[in-house]
């Protein structure tokens, strides 16, 4: 399976550097970013598009899907952003990710969700091309899982808006083909929130 991982386009929460809720829609720049990643991926023969149910990811996935009318469009809760608890609507610099309160989803929980969604896609589309459209925290967990890193690994894995990472999974072997590539945004710009 060829797995393409991308993050949603820019939102107001990204611009303001706050941790936003499920209804944070794409900005006009976020829509441009989604259009750019869509055009970049239009020659891929995508079999399935898995999306988070959150508006920002779903809209990005819908824009990608316009070039892939035969791809199965699947909303999956395992691709939701991490549960933010008391960190919801806080500024990024107000948050201590090393000492998470109990109401904030930890890296191990995200890693378990990552494992579930990767294995689900792999079982349904073992020879297919699949794209995940999701969020920063869960995408980082998916990449940690595919790299066989410890769930609590704190190494910074950047996830720019609509950045693309590609992994080839075959016969139990995983090859990373591309990581956090945003060349499709050269004329638009990107941020790393």
Each model region followed by its residue ranges:
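Acidic, His/Gly-rich catalytic cores of divalent-metal-dependent hydrolytic chemistry
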Residues: 177-193
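General small-molecule cofactor/ligand-binding pocket signal
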Residues: 4, 74-76, 177
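Domain-level recognition of soluble alpha/beta enzyme cores
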Residues: 150-175
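Generic beta-sheet signal
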Residues: 3, 126-136
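Phosphate-coordination/substrate-recognition cap region in phosphate-metabolizing enzymes
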Residues: 35-101
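Glycine-rich phosphate-binding loop signature in dinucleotide/nucleotide-binding domains
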Residues: 43-45, 121-129
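Short active-site segment of divalent metal-dependent hydrolases/proteases
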Residues: 11, 138-139
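Loop-to-helix element that buttresses phosphate recognition and phosphoryl-transfer chemistry
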Residues: 3-59, 103-115
């Amino acid at each position: 399976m060829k797995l393409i991982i991308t993050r949603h386009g820019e939102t107001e929460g990204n611009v303001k550097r706050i941790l936003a809720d499920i209804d944070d829609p794409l900005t006009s720049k976020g829509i441009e970013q989604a259009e750019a990643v869509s055009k970049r991926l239009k020659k891929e023969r995508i079999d399935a598009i898995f999306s988070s149910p959150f508006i920002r990811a779903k809209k990005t996935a819908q824009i990608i899907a316009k070039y892939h009318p035969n791809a199965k469009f699947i909303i999956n809760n395992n691709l939701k952003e991490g549960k933010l608890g008391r960190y919801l609507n806080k500024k990024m610099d107000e948050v201590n990710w090393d000492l998470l309160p109990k109401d904030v989803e930890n890296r191990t929980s995200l890693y378990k969700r990552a494992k579930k969604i990767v294995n689900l896609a792999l079982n349904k589309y073992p020879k297919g091309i699949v794209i995940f459209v999701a969020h920063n925290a869960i995408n980082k967990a998916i990449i940690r899982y595919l790299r066989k890193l410890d769930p609590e690994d704190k190494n910074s894995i950047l996830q720019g808006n609509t950045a693309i990472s590609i992994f080839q999974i075959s016969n139990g072997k995983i090859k990373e083909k591309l990581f956090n590539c945003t060349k499709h945004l050269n004329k638009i710009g990107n941020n790393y929130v």
